[in-house]
Curated annotation (Swiss-Prot):
Subcellular location: Cell membrane
Organism: Haloarcula marismortui (strain ATCC 43049 / DSM 3752 / JCM 8966 / VKM B-1809) (Halobacterium marismortui)
Protein known as: Dihydroorotate dehydrogenase (quinone)
Positions of substrate binding: K71, N116, R117, M118, G119, L120, N177, N182, N242, T243
Self-association and partners: Monomer.
BP GO terms, sorted: 'de novo' pyrimidine nucleobase biosynthetic process; 'de novo' UMP biosynthetic process
Enzymatic class: oxidoreductase
Catalytic reactions of this protein: (S)-dihydroorotate + a quinone = orotate + a quinol
Sections of the chain in a coiled coil: none
């Protein structure tokens, strides 16, 4: 039995957000200690076959932590000790935000899923930017940039630029979040003109590498418009996808009635197909997100065109050994299929 199997019943007896904060505090306390070194020895899978080159950075392995887990950039180094290949912090907004009223995070235990309507609560770009300057993580750290809640569509480009300028020094890559389902005003940002204005403003500010994060709920023509922009503006990558407001009929948990973005196992196949759709249409690295919790699931996304994968909900349900388990499994799957590296397997099913 893994230690997390012992701790999980207690954590799951707490409200989801309370448990999340408790885990964060624990991870913060081990940062820079001998415990972090022991964790790194235990959880890191060192194998050159897992390494990936993407948007100008080397990732020791393709498994990262998605935005939303480390909102305020307080634990990147500790996440590296858990064996992850990178982390994306945020979403970060120009001003501090309290987010939506609680409760705002719900476990769907029977479905291995989460619904959240957090509302982009974060410490704000000034505080997080200063914090990022002091981060000394041994892996690439991305910054998810989002719109401040009270800012309208016309003012959004300047708002995103302000956030970027505060976090620029501490980020290794930047993800433009125009697809958050839990904050007002994001739907309008996903039309072509609004998205182009935001992305162009960030490029004018020097934001690079620059990626855009898309919603799984966009109709196909809107996704194609967004991907046309990726090519026209010469962006560096695409993150596919965000959480979904849709509710599959297969959901069994009582909390399925809650509003917010759904993440976890129920959206795994939908997210993988979105990765495939994107990878078939653009010639930039794709970061696959949605329902990743096993080596097999990560491998399906990689074969569908993802150069990297991210997870959040899987960490909640599977615990701190998840990166090691996925990376160990990926190593075996690559060998079984005769691939010399993860990079060789990217897009194998296209």
């Amino acid at each position: 039995m893994r230690p997390y199997d012992i701790a999980k019943p207690f954590l799951f007896s707490l409200p989801a957000e309370t448990a999340n904060k408790s885990v964060h505090r624990l991870l913060e306390t081990v940062d820079g200690t001998r415990v972090a070194d022991v964790m790194a020895d235990r959880y890191t899978v060192a194998d050159e076959r897992l390494a990936v080159e993407a948007f100008g950075h080397t990732f020791d392995n393709p498994v990262g932590v998605a935005a939303g887990f480390d909102k305020n950039a307080t634990i990147p180094e500790t996440l590296a000790s858990l064996g992850f290949g990178f982390a994306e912090v945020g979403g970060v907004t120009a001003e501090p935000q309290a987010g939506n009223a609680r409760p705002r995070m719900f476990r769907l235990k029977a479905d291995e899923a989460i619904i959240n309507r957090m509302g982009l609560n974060n410490d704000g770009a000034i505080v997080i930017g200063e914090r990022l300057k002091n981060v000394d993580a041994p892996f690439p750290v991305g910054v998810n940039i989002a719109k401040t809640e009270h800012v309208g569509t016309n003012e959004a480009p300047d708002d995103y630029r302000t956030t970027y300028e505060h976090v620029a020094e501490g980020g290794d890559f930047f993800v433009v979040n125009v697809s958050c389902p839990n904050s007002e005003g994001f739907e309008e940002l996903q039309n072509r003109d609004a998205m182009e204005a935001i992305l162009s403003e960030l490029q004018d500010a020097g934001a690079a590498p620059l990626l855009v994060k898309l919603s799984p709920d966009l109709p196909e023509p809107a996704v194609e418009d967004a991907l046309d922009l990726v090519t026209e503006l010469d962006l560096d990558g695409v993150v596919a996808t965000n959480t979904t407001t849709e509710r599959p009929a297969s959901l069994r948990s009582p909390n399925a009635v809650e509003t917010g973005g759904l993440s976890g196992k129920p959206i795994e196949n939908q997210a993988t197909e979105m990765v495939r759709f994107v990878a078939e249409r653009v010639d930039v690295p794709v970061v696959g997100v949605g329902g990743v919790s096993t080596a097999e699931g990560a491998y399906r996304k990689i074969r569908a065109g993802a150069s990297l994968v991210q997870l959040y909900t899987g960490l909640v349900y599977r615990g701190p050994s998840i990166a090691r388990e996925i990376n160990s499994g990926l190593r075996d799957l690559l060998a079984e299929d005769g691939f010399d590296s993860v990079e060789d397997a990217v897009g194998a099913d296209l």
